[in-house]
């Protein structure tokens, strides 16, 4: 094997190893990148009743579809997204490139985000990250703010409203909590 081929293979395997480690880390502390179905995104945004001047947050924004759809629905909102999976983050940056004035994206963990200005938070997270941050949500979010969680409940919280599942389309429930 030539030295050039050897080094190209080493670079390829190194990049693959880093990619796999980052993916494993993201899955351990949050959730894997699984985009919410478009119909669910629309339902969640409709349920949030977005108004001019509101701030919305997606703590695991993935490819940015929730934030982008929210901004198209109500152009006078501010949208903030956090993502740990680099490929999804890059995809979100690309998809939201024409909405930079409305959408701010961060490549970091949302556990340390400032929630004091958030009016609505859209979640498609597993039970553990929701439970881990439940006290933060309750103490930092505005009174009257909404948390809309697709598929997973916040342990120990009573939902304000539940949008029923649609089994024939493989859609889970949407749990809406009011602070």
Task: Report the location of each language-model feature.
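A short SAM/SAH-binding and catalytic strip from SAM-dependent methyltransferases
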Residues: 118-132
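Conserved SAM-binding loop of SAM-dependent methyltransferases across substrates and taxa
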Residues: 65-75
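Conserved class I S-adenosyl-L-methionine
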Residues: 53-62
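Conserved SAM-binding loop
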Residues: 92
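Conserved SAM-binding motif I beta-strand of class I
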Residues: 78-83
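S-adenosyl-L-methionine
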Residues: 1-51
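C-terminal substrate-binding/active-site "lid" region of AdoMet-derived donor-dependent transferases
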Residues: 129-179
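Conserved SAM-binding strand-loop segment of SAM-dependent methyltransferases
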Residues: 99-110
């Amino acid at each position: 094997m030539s030295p050039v081929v050897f080094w190209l293979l080493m670079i390829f395997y190194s990049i693959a190893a880093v990619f796999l480690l980052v993916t494993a880390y993201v899955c351990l502390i949050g959730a894997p990148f699984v985009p919410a179905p478009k119909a669910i995104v629309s339902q969640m945004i409709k349920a949030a009743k977005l108004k001019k001047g509101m701030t919305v947050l997606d703590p695991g924004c993935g490819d940015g579809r929730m934030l982008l759809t929210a901004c198209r629905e109500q152009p006078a909102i501010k949208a903030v997204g956090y993502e740990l999976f680099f490929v999804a983050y890059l995809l979100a940056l690309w998809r939201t490139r024409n909405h930079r004035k409305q959408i701010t994206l961060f490549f970091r963990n949302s556990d340390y985000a400032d929630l004091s200005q958030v009016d609505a938070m859209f979640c498609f997270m597993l039970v553990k990250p929701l439970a881990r941050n439940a006290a933060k949500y309750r103490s930092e979010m505005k009174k009257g703010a909404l948390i809309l969680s697709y598929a997973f409940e916040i342990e120990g919280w009573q939902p304000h409203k539940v949008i029923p599942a649609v089994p024939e389309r493989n859609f889970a429930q949407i749990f809406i909590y009011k602070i």
